[in-house]
Design a protein with these regions (language model features):
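Active-site neighborhood of divalent metal-dependent phosphoester/pyrophosphate hydrolases
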Residues: 39-46
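Active-site regions of metal-assisted phosphoester/phosphodiester hydrolases
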Residues: 1-35, 59-60, 64-67, 73-237
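Short consensus segments that form the blades of beta-propeller domains
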Residues: 46-47, 106
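Generic alpha-helical scaffold signal
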Residues: 18, 47-51
Length: 237
């Protein structure tokens, strides 16, 4: 099966700086993936442009979907992570990540969540986790702990995807790499960067897995969002 992770930045066409859901629907369709993890998605809100992007993409692609709301921008406009998939969704939930008690780092702080879903992949249950981690080290520590708890509570084959906002050598993600393999190890171009798409200089987007064999992995080097997506082909062991 093919899986993709993509920070879509509100479905903002990076080239033209307008919200363009059909552009993203067509791009995702081109990749022909079975599971697609999306970060920075909007839900139906009161502001102009805050529409239900998950259902719009899901309807366009004729696939199952789930939206995990992390926050409401200015109290009325949902924003979070989403999962699109051709497989039946047996269960899905939004797991909120604890916020740090103190905000001492000079970065933007934001409440985060993880999307937890169990999919029926050809008769076998597979755990999927989608997460967009914070910029502050204290935020990432809570996010990593939360995702590890989700993983440790299950024995299912698992895929963890998303924009983690930190590189592998930062050390912040080590507990995840102790539990999971990184599809990047089979990337067609070793060390390929995912951000920013207009001048890539770091890899902060990931497809991690357990209970699978990774057959291939590649970064799609096309400027649609401010991130490049990653696509990997996995087979259940």
């Amino acid at each position: 099966m093919k899986v993709m992770t993509f920070n879509v930045q509100h479905c903002l066409d990076y080239q033209n700086q307008i919200i363009d859901i059909p552009l993203f629907a067509d791009f995702i369709k081109e990749q022909n993936v079975d599971i697609c993890a999306l970060n920075e998605m909007r839900g139906e809100g009161n502001w102009e442009g805050y529409t239900d992007q998950t259902n719009a993409l899901g309807d366009s692609l004729s696939c199952n979907r789930y939206f995990a709301e992390a926050i409401k921008v200015v109290g009325t406009n949902p924003y979070g992570n989403a999962l699109l998939t051709r497989y039946p969704v047996k269960s899905a939930e939004t797991v909120h990540i604890p916020d740090p008690d103190e905000r001492t780092e000079d970065v933007h702080y934001e409440h985060r969540c993880a999307l937890r879903a169990v999919l029926d992949v050809d008769g076998r249950d597979v755990l999927c986790v989608v997460c967009h981690m914070g910029l502050a080290k204290s935020e990432v520590a809570f996010a990593v702990k939360t995702v590890c708890q989700i993983l440790d509570e299950s024995t299912l084959p698992a895929i963890v995807m998303g924009d983690f906002n930190h590189t592998k050598d930062s050390g912040m993600l080590t507990p995840l790499f102790e539990r999971l393999s990184d599809a990047d190890e089979l990337c067609e171009r070793a060390g390929i960067y995912t951000f920013p798409s207009y001048a890539p200089r770091e890899k902060i987007d990931y497809i991690l897995y357990r209970g699978f064999k990774c057959e291939s992995c590649r970064v799609i080097e096309k400027i649609v969002s401010d991130h490049f997506p990653i696509v990997a082909e996995l087979t259940v062991e």
